[in-house]
From Swiss-Prot:
This is Sodium-dependent glucose transporter 1. It comes from the Eukaryota. The keyword Hydrolase does not apply. It is a multi-pass membrane protein. Pfam families: MFS_1. It comes from Danio rerio (Zebrafish).
Amino acid sequence: MSPAEAAPRKKHVRFARMEGDVDHDDQEENTLFDKQKDVKEGLKSVLKGGKGILSQGSGQVDVVRPGRSKTGTCWRWLVSLALCASFLGLGMAISVLGPTFEDLAINVNKNISNLSYIFVGRASGYIGGSLLGGILFDFVNPHLLLGFALLTTAFGMSGTPFCKKAWVLTVLMSSVGVSMGVLDTGGNVLILNTWGEQAGPHMQALHFSFAAGAFASPIIAKLLFGHHNSSTNTSLMSGHASKTIDAVLPFSHPKGTSTIDLPWMWAYIVIGAFVLLVSLLFFSLYFCISTNSNRTKTASGKQQFSKHHNTLIILLSMFFFFYVGSEVAYGSFIFTYGKDYVHMEETEAAGLNSLFWGAFAAGRGLAIFFAACLHPGTLILLSLVGTTVSSLLLCLFSQNYPMLWACTALYGISMSTTFPSGISWVEQYTTVTGRSAAIFVVGAALGEMVLPALLGFLLGHVQNYPLLMYLTLCTATFTSILFPVLYKLASPEGNVTLRKSSGKCTIKDADDSEYRQALLENMEEQEENESEADLCNDADFEVIEMDDASLLSSPKSSPPADVAASVPDVHLVASPLSEPNMLSFSTDSPRSKL
């Protein structure tokens, strides 16, 4: 045999199969692997629709959540504006009672000391409304519920000047307190449900609106519609104007008093009219926006709750008890402290009081911008450091004028962000439902009632010590110890990944990283399944022999005896050669190239 004839030739070997196996294999391919291919196609379509990008070498996928259209964003901004307007009215409605309390007592023919129980009635209604709102908010449309709460507040505020009996005024104030409690609870939950992980700045704006309303209400009550001397008003008003006012406002002459005008009542009417307009806005939102709330849910459709959900809610409510109680106590008694203990003039003490509330409102305004770039936990830590340092300095330098002014401003700014930041912080670890928000508000309301009353009782018995500063230091220390405990419960070891992120949704968000990891694992699994399906489903294949003499000369090129015996039918499409060198197989897969 010549060397040319001994050279290996290219051979094509095709395995034959029975015709009856064709339908069986096709059916097997359709039934076993079609779903896997469909899953991959569906995954690709989801990635395409969600604008997911798989970067080679990075192992990361950018996930852009659906439902973030421009129209949806506009509606969410409208809800935020409506909530801010409602909290502006809430702040005005709560704080207007103080500047007009003496006028209300005159209107119902009572002394101030005999009418103080209306504060208790309103506070009791506020707590009851918070609990009621927390229950109803999980079952009733939030826009409709807040609309009715604002409507009740509007009618209560407008009807307050018309109350001629003390018990009627107390009942009315209690009903207004109920509606305020519903509004306070529902507003905090709705802003979380509307914005989700982006709720931080909007939560700060919500509570800034409340502070702005509380700041503006005394101005409306006293500067715009303040009580003027009766003789002065008589000299300025013509007889025709006086008769007109008497005809329209017959209640302006209380029984047993001389002719007196009550212009302060217009403050209640103006506030009531404003709240009424906001309630109409919420009714409009009810008819324009679907009832679906954006609660955070898992893939199974259930809300996500922390393992220590109940403990977190109770401890955070205790945290708010001391925080709000200290805030109200300082704002209520700093005037008395400056006048009696530091021996300030009344104007200086009033300026110190105004400095605290002004710094408080300014801090909440600045927190809107800081919340967009800082984590809520960071804001809480900064607040705790500020309150602790300022209260410690106030205790050490309790009679130092410059230190008193500087630390009062620092204390007001530090206290401003704690409540909204606390709600935003706990929302990252567990779902804040209506009941949870109700517990927060009730804790804050109880602190507002208990700590100022306790401080007032102590001041009546101990007058030579700066009890106000001691109270602020104790509450700041307690909250500084309690917050690390809350953080430990919320982020136990091995589960420190946040469920949601605050601020903008970026590639480093914890929840997006979970989605990316899930998508990557699914894609790898689908690729493996598809590869296996392609290998197993192809019963027809060709084995192409390479023009490689060394391959045929290798002793490993001969197939094992059992493999050669298992070949059902071989059709040679070439000149025959020696049988041992005819075929070569790989044990990995029947679809290999030799």
